[in-house]
Amino acid sequence: MPEELTPTPETAVVEAGPVSRWLSENGFENTALERDHLGVEIVQVDREVLLPIAAALFAYGFNYLQCQGGYDLGPGQDLVSFYHLTKVSDDASQPQEVRVKVFLPRHDPKVPSVFWIWKGADWQERETFDMYGIQFEGHPNLKRILMPEDWVGWPLRKDYISPDFYELQDAY
């Protein structure tokens, strides 16, 4: 009797949602990922096509960047920059939402800034840079926002080693 293969989350086929289908129909490469626990559609895109896809989604009505953030998949694995977008309209009782994810190699965590599409990305991209070291190319003021400017490393990376001592400088 042949052995049956049980799909894992990495190999399971995910049905493309309406946003993923719209992107594909309009020539934008993307991969549909499993929806989150609230049913929000998630699409994965390559960093090289993030800006054209972001501009297309803005034109499609996703005019509000609800959240931009990052996370670390683990030591030696990718970093992820994500964008939670919402269609804000007159009928906002059930706004459409989508989350866009860009997986970045740990040794080269660079992605274009979406600041020029959604101004709200300003501080959010700075925080993601400060905590994970993801470089947002084209950001007008990419510098640390939470940690001291001379801080070494990226505190929320899973391979980060905390310094034994850090001396705060007096403000005067």
From Swiss-Prot:
<protein>
    <recommendedName>
        <fullName>NAD(P)H-quinone oxidoreductase subunit J</fullName>
        <ecNumber>7.1.1.-</ecNumber>
    </recommendedName>
</protein>
<keyword id="KW-0874">Quinone</keyword>
<dbReference type="GO" id="GO:0031676">
    <property type="term" value="C:plasma membrane-derived thylakoid membrane"/>
</dbReference>
<dbReference type="InterPro" id="IPR037232">
    <property type="entry name" value="NADH_quin_OxRdtase_su_C/D-like"/>
</dbReference>
<keyword id="KW-0520">NAD</keyword>
<keyword id="KW-0793">Thylakoid</keyword>
<dbReference type="InterPro" id="IPR010218">
    <property type="entry name" value="NADH_DH_suC"/>
</dbReference>
<dbReference type="InterPro" id="IPR001268">
    <property type="entry name" value="NADH_UbQ_OxRdtase_30kDa_su"/>
</dbReference>
<keyword id="KW-0618">Plastoquinone</keyword>
<comment type="function">
    <text>NDH-1 shuttles electrons from an unknown electron donor, via FMN and iron-sulfur (Fe-S) centers, to quinones in the respiratory and/or the photosynthetic chain. The immediate electron acceptor for the enzyme in this species is believed to be plastoquinone. Couples the redox reaction to proton translocation, and thus conserves the redox energy in a proton gradient. Cyanobacterial NDH-1 also plays a role in inorganic carbon-concentration.</text>
</comment>
<comment type="similarity">
    <text>Belongs to the complex I 30 kDa subunit family.</text>
</comment>
<dbReference type="Pfam" id="PF00329">
    <property type="entry name" value="Complex1_30kDa"/>
</dbReference>
<dbReference type="InterPro" id="IPR020396">
    <property type="entry name" value="NADH_UbQ_OxRdtase_CS"/>
</dbReference>
<keyword id="KW-1278">Translocase</keyword>
<dbReference type="GO" id="GO:0019684">
    <property type="term" value="P:photosynthesis, light reaction"/>
</dbReference>
<comment type="subunit">
    <text>NDH-1 can be composed of about 15 different subunits; different subcomplexes with different compositions have been identified which probably have different functions.</text>
</comment>
<dbReference type="GO" id="GO:0048038">
    <property type="term" value="F:quinone binding"/>
</dbReference>
<keyword id="KW-0813">Transport</keyword>
<keyword id="KW-0472">Membrane</keyword>
<dbReference type="GO" id="GO:0008137">
    <property type="term" value="F:NADH dehydrogenase (ubiquinone) activity"/>
</dbReference>
<keyword id="KW-0521">NADP</keyword>
